């Protein structure tokens, strides 16, 4: 191979690597966006649960106890 062919080969290899990296980055970006949505949903659920706990007994001096949540079949 002469120098020009070697350079063309190297450029082709770099273009292939770049295309593969772009594909991986796009996949990772989609995954991060999905995880962000999941995190936002979980944070909203946690805020709702916290608000429900506060609404149940807003003036209580003692912490919330799971013993207050005995299932109805007991």
Curated annotation (Swiss-Prot):
<dbReference type="InterPro" id="IPR007236">
    <property type="entry name" value="SlyX"/>
</dbReference>
<comment type="similarity">
    <text>Belongs to the SlyX family.</text>
</comment>
<dbReference type="Pfam" id="PF04102">
    <property type="entry name" value="SlyX"/>
</dbReference>
<protein>
    <recommendedName>
        <fullName>Protein SlyX homolog</fullName>
    </recommendedName>
</protein>
